[in-house]
Amino acid sequence: MTFLIQQTLIYAIPLMIVALAGVFAERSGIINLALEGIMIFGAFIGVLFVRLMQGSEAVLAAKQAGDWVALQGLELLTMLVAAAMGAVFSLLLSFASINLRADQTIGGTALNLMAPALVLFLIRIIANQNTLQMATGDSASWFMLKKSTFGVDKSVDWGFFGETFLNKIYLATYICILLFIILSVILYKTKFGLRLRACGENPQAADSLGINVYRMRYAGVTISGALAGMGGFVYAMTTANCSSNGDVAGFGFLALAVMIFGNWKPLNIAGASLLFGLFKCIAAAYASIDINGDGVFLLADIGISAHLYRMLPYLITLLVLAFTSKKSRAPKAEGIPYDKGTR
């Protein structure tokens, strides 16, 4: 059960934070179909930043001394860098959609096509191969919280809660959960959030009250890009073996499905992310999931084809959207370019 919960969180957290990214953009009135592309770019930037930092004196000293606080600081700094570059990358969509009033679906699709090509081009220049590794050696262990991080021997039993939520888990998981809560409160309990949502529902009415619709939409897409970029790095660190290869396994599109399934509401999105994370976990680790807890009968022993397990997350996506999309209520003005002269 510990393994299942930890792996579910590993898959659910990037989905949750990127789905919230989609909410911020669409609540402002812009369809951010480019979440996949921004994730790919954020993953690349995060991996490249750690790769560049691994040779610095501070990181080398922290590794040799076992200074886990400094390494966790590097993890947080990399999350911020990936978020910043994701925000910059999203400005391409903002400019095309807000200033040029281009079709937002086409603009997002263009970024989704450009991002993997650009990332692979840069990886070839940097590493002369198709995959960019974060660092030499087991870089995942740098950022993972373990018993040794807290000065406890690995033979000590922490019980179910400690073994599940404090051992062999990433600090980024809890940072993203905290960020998700804070941003959800900002979106629904602050003046900024009210203005942002007004621009996605009735921009003409918002404009008549003195709200700068263009500025609010830029803010929504920029926050969306920052979250998607951060989600891309978290995916690369926790799921993609600390590497970037111009692909995030469709997590950006899955996040869009989670957003729609969650009806653009943070609490629903959190639940949907855990559901999709569970099925991604089953698809990726079915051969290791112990059904009875005795280490004998594994999920793989049922006799179901491995291909079906790998299809599960995407089959569930289709089924969920088929049965819930009719009840979903998107912001009324999403996807519609705002013209100040129309009423």
Go through each PLM region and give its residues.
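Short loop segments and helix-boundary regions at transmembrane helix junctions
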Residues: 25-31, 91-152, 189, 249-250, ...
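Membrane-interfacial amphipathic/re-entrant helices at transmembrane-helix boundaries
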Residues: 1-18, 31, 45, 52-77
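Extracellular/periplasmic helix-loop junction at the C-terminal end of a transmembrane helix
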Residues: 116-161, 283-297, 326-335
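Cytosolic-side transmembrane-helix boundaries in multi-pass membrane proteins
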Residues: 183, 201-208, 213-215, 287-343
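Alpha-helical transmembrane segments within multi-pass membrane transporters and channels
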Residues: 60-116
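Transmembrane alpha-helical segments in multi-pass inner-membrane proteins
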Residues: 228, 239-314
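Helix-loop-helix "hairpin" substructures at the membrane interface of multi-pass membrane proteins
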Residues: 164-243, 271
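Loop-to-helix entry region at the N-terminal start of transmembrane alpha-helices
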Residues: 3-11, 156-182, 309-314
